[in-house]
């Protein structure tokens, strides 16, 4: 009996890599394995472009050693100019600033830099060994890391000034045994004396000096009819076992010198030292939040500044009104303060979204929310939204207002309830690429960096090879296309020796601003204005620029000099670094043609590829070469065989192309799609197809059709 023939069309091979499906349950449109393919939302699949330096690139004046780390951040609204944005590049212990205003990007480094060793915390791992986190507020940049005292950078017309933030809090910690404070003590301990003064006793302005009274109510509750303190009146008040309010003293958060503040010696903790420093910083609700201390006492502590009007407000993390005051003890909505999450372990990242601040620790995620959509010091809530924490801060990325991060178990995101605003964690890798993710080396996961392309809606995570000796080198990319909800991997190949390499990622929107100096003239431009000393008078103004297409920018280290420059995936020569081949391929899932029992054949596959040639280079003497030629190699494997048959060329043009020497920009081919029919040998119950690139050539696969023959015999 003759075979029954059917046809199948595939035109949406863009679901990405799937490793969590079995042979019999593999989803349509997904790949079993793939590398270096660009999945496009129109349903096509293309070879990624090669990596190269930007046009007219410049090398940095500084070098990057094998052991130096690199971290990247953004400074927005620089100096209060909404159009001015800097890329902040941490190289070891130095911060460099690149204006995002103009091309080439690598030439836009500012003349100023910040030496972090000047603010290094004694006993830390060193400023060069701790990556910074950044927050922008009111045109200023706040910089934190576990190795430095938190600083703020101000932009002052082509220069910056740096100041260390001094964190002040009110002391709400009782020093003595509070169970004895419900009664008078004629011989109070030194700790009790401090606690009495911290509740308002012996602090001047009419406060009595007697430190023997019980601390169940404030001293001014004992005033007589004349407004004077009366010990007998104070004694008439029953306070029970309630402690009065404290917090009169304002102390430095990192060095709580109670002896100096109170003048009392002999305290159990005269000076309370916090040796660690804030790892995280985030601006939210007009304030700056700080977290990430490593001590047992303060691991879950989050400080937040008062509503910041000036730089001096950034360290005011306390109630402005004295809580022991008789008339103005109230906590104000605009005050600073302290939030404690006792069960948080190693807070890694703070992220502000809508009316909430999300706290990412190693052991979970917490949400700090305001009331009625506004965070205030006197009205907020804290709740835990996930027990899945953040592996390390640079895996975190925000895309379309939604956080994505790597944990010890996979890649996660948060969805928020549109009514309550409460977050809910979702694991993205369990149904998709968990096996692929698990295979990434544990040390490599600790060096992941990320960025988000907000134009093309893609998240890029980059990480090194196993055992990579260069601290900041990144060879591998895992990409998540948000609209497609598809993961796909890329890999940058090394040159044979002294290879260039990627060390960082950034996103450039294509817009920016820069400061211009204009010569001041008079008399309709005829006369130049100078000072009495003969110096030329100029006027500074900020102008906006369109820098071109938005793009992911790669920060690269030049292999010959170890200096830095910028590049991207832009080479239509389809070679990495201009001379190194890379393989682009994709393998389809297991196609049983709707039948698990019968054996089949696929005598013909018809592929559809878009014409990619864009013209010619060369001349009559040396010949002409097509610009951006394509090649697509196709092979098949039957049943569950991992060895594919010999490949065939699927990009076959039917018509000759005549070169017009007078117009090399034209590639005069009559069709925009190359259609090729391939004969396929073999048979089996299922078939897989592999598409692969050829060195130095493009491909753009639109889809394919398969003629399927089914054998009526089993």
Regions found by a protein language model. Give the residues of each.
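Beta-sheet repeat architectures centered on beta-propellers
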Residues: 1-109, 124-139, 345, 388-391, ...
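N-terminal beta-propeller domains
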Residues: 1-114, 157, 164-366, 463-482
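Elongated alpha-helical scaffolds
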Residues: 90, 120-156, 288
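Intrinsically disordered, low-complexity serine/threonine-rich repeat tracts
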Residues: 122-124, 146, 205, 223-226, ...
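Short, surface-exposed terminal/edge motifs of secreted or surface/virion proteins that either
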Residues: 147-163, 300-304, 408, 413-416, ...
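A short alpha->loop->secondary-structure connector
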Residues: 158-164, 374-379
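Conserved catalytic-core segments centered on acid/base and nucleophilic motifs
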Residues: 348-361, 366-368, 393-407, 411-414
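Surface-exposed extracellular loop regions of Gram-negative outer-membrane beta-barrel proteins
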Residues: 357-385
């Amino acid at each position: 009996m003759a075979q029954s023939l059917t046809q199948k069309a595939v035109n949406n091979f863009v679901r990405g890599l799937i490793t969590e499906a079995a042979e019999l349950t593999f989803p349509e449109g997904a790949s079993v394995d793939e590398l270096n393919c660009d999945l496009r939302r129109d349903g096509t699949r293309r070879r990624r472009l090669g990596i190269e330096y930007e046009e007219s690139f410049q090398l940095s004046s500084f070098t990057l050693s094998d052991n130096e780390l690199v971290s990247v951040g953004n400074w927005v609204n620089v100096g209060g100019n909404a159009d001015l944005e800097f890329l902040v590049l941490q190289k070891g212990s130095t911060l460099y600033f690149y204006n995002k205003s103009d091309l080439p990007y690598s030439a836009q480094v500012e003349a100023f830099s910040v030496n972090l060793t000047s603010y290094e915390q004694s006993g830390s791992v060193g400023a060069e060994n701790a990556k910074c986190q950044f927050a922008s507020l009111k045109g200023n940049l706040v910089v934190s890391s576990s190795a430095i005292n938190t600083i703020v950078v101000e932009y002052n017309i082509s220069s910056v000034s740096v100041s260390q933030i001094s964190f002040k809090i009110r002391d709400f910690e009782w020093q003595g045994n509070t169970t004895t404070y419900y009664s008078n003590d004629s011989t109070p301990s030194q700790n009790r004396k401090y606690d009495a003064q911290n509740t308002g006793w012996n602090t001047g302005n009419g406060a009595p000096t007697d430190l023997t009274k019980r601390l169940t109510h404030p001293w001014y509750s004992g005033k007589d009819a004349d407004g004077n303190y009366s010990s007998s009146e104070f004694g008439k008040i029953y306070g029970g076992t309630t402690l009065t309010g404290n917090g009169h003293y304002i102390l430095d958060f990192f060095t709580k010198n109670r002896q100096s503040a109170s003048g009392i010696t002999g305290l159990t903790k005269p000076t309370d030292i916090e040796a660690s420093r804030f790892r995280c910083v985030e601006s939210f609700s007009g304030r700056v939040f700080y977290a990430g201390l490593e001590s047992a006492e303060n691991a879950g502590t989050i400080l937040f500044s008062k509503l910041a009007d000036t730089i001096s407000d950034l360290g005011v993390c306390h109630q402005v009104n004295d809580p022991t005051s008789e008339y103005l003890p109230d906590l104000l909505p605009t005050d600073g303060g302290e939030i404690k999450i006792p069960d948080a372990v190693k807070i890694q990242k703070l992220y502000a979204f809508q009316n909430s601040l999300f706290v990412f620790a190693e052991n979970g995620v917490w949400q700090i929310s305001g009331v009625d959509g506004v965070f205030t010091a006197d009205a907020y809530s804290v709740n835990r939204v996930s027990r899945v924490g953040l592996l390390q801060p640079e895996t975190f990325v925000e895309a379309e207002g939604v956080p994505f991060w790597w944990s010890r178990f996979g890649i996660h995101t948060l969805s928020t309830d549109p009514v309550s605003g409460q977050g809910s964690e979702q694991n993205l890798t369990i149904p998709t690429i968990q096996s692929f993710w698990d295979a990434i080396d544990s040390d490599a996961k600790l060096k992941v960096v990320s960025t988000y392309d907000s134009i093309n809606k893609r998240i890029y995570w980059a990480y090194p090879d196993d055992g990579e000796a260069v601290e900041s080198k990144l060879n591998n990319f895992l990409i998540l296309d948000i609209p497609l909800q598809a993961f796909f991997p890329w890999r940058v190949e090394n040159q044979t020796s002294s290879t260039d390499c990627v060390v960082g990622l950034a996103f450039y929107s294509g817009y920016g601003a820069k400061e211009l100096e204009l010569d001041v003239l008079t008399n309709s431009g005829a006369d130049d204005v100078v000072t009495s000393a003969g110096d030329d008078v100029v006027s500074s103004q900020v102008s906006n620029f369109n820098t071109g297409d938005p793009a992911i920018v790669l920060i690269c280290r030049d292999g010959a000099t170890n200096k830095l420059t910028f590049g991207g995936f832009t080479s239509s020569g389809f070679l990495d670094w201009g001379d190194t081949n890379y393989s682009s391929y994709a393998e389809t899932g297991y196609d049983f043609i709707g039948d698990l029992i019968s054996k089949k054949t696929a005598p013909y596959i018809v592929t559809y590829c878009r014409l990619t040639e864009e013209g010619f280079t060369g001349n009559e003497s040396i010949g002409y070469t097509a610009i951006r030629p394509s090649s697509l190699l196709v092979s098949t494997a039957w049943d569950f065989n991992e060895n594919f048959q010999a490949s065939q060329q699927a990009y076959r043009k039917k018509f000759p192309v005549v070169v017009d020497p007078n117009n090399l920009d034209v590639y005069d081919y009559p069709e925009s799609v190359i259609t090729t029919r391939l004969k396929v040998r073999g048979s089996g119950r299922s078939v897989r197809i592999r598409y692969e690139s050829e060195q130095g050539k493009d491909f753009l696969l639109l889809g394919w059709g398969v003629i399927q023959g089914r054998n009526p015999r089993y």
